[in-house]
Amino acid sequence: MNIPTSLVQTLAVQSQLNLPGTAGRLLKQIRDLENVAPRFVEAGLVLTVDRPASLDTRLSGISTRFTTAKLAGGFLFVCAAVRMDLRFDRNALATEGTDSASVIDDIDFLDQSKRLQLIEVRQAYEMADHAMKMEAPPRILLIEGPLVLNRSMVPLGKASQHAKEYERAVETIRAFWKQHESKLFPWNPAGTVVAGIATERLGAIAAISQQDLRTIEGQQQLLKCDLPKAEILGDINRQRSSISGIGEKRFVRGILGTNSRTAAFKMDVQTPRMEPADLVDDQGVVGFHYRSSVLAEPLLVQLLGNDASWTRQQLNELAGVLIAATVQREGYAVPVPFQLAQQQLHSLKNFLDQYCLTMRRELKNREVEDSWLSDLES
């Protein structure tokens, strides 16, 4: 006979039953990671990065955000991008300037999610284009999100607004790299380095293919400059079963310590049809994770390039600057330009709420309609 129980009672019983098993499983994973993490360092799959004692560089960061509000059976949205231009002079930070772009419109529910993500990507590249047209472009340009798009963003229907926005985003990316090729790394070894940073907020947008450093297949996609020591790698692979059940995020967090990065890996090998395809086929896409402190979560960096483009020294120098520019704030750690840009983007929700109130008032009073009709009557 089933005895009716409340949800509170059910949760209390389940928590008591599952707590010991879950805690034991997590503790075992932590112990396994602690045992194997030093071997990843010895093999060269995890590298310690020298944090620059004196940071002297010009660094720009582009952050994007969108928000929606219900109106008349549909949605209004506002999508915005903010770029912060910073200068580090002997670790002293100064703001050189800022730029922004925004769009406000209505949107259908079915089109909402991916279409707005594509608008974010396009706006980020528009801000990057403005930065490269400045008299003195930044040394490093960070984009909060992906540098290229993968198949998860391809629209299903060809006639939808999503499809049109997808084509606009792809063309904007292609035009940026083509127009500024002479100013950008890897075409110009002394040019601006453009890097995509996959933060927690944009994990779904980035949808970036990662190489699993625990598997032989993932290890085969490492850049030549970061190839590990074969003999130690063999020992790690023989212990692979003990860490194979650990999630990718927990695994990366467990092997990375303070001021460290993973070996760089090719990101376009297991994900064909990254777009723009011609750009990806020509240059390739590489990535690595870095971690600035034990309190910070690892961040994934995406770069254009291949074996011929990057050296270990160049990757270490870039990681060192990113580590020095990453600051812990309100429970998360991202580069300083993103934090400053997000302070401006926090106002989007309040702005859209006020905009909706005004729109409802206009619709209720029919003032817009009356103004159109008055023109016809005259």
Regions from the language model: what does each represent?
Residues 1-52, 57, 121-378:
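Long, contiguous domain-sized segments
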Residues 30-35, 108-115:
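Short, basic, glycine/proline-bearing loop/turn elements
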Residues 57-67:
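Two-metal-ion RNase H-like nuclease active-site motif
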Residues 66-107:
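Acidic, metal-ligating active-site segments
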Residues 118:
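Metallocofactor- and cofactor-centric catalytic cores in central/energy metabolism, strongly enriched
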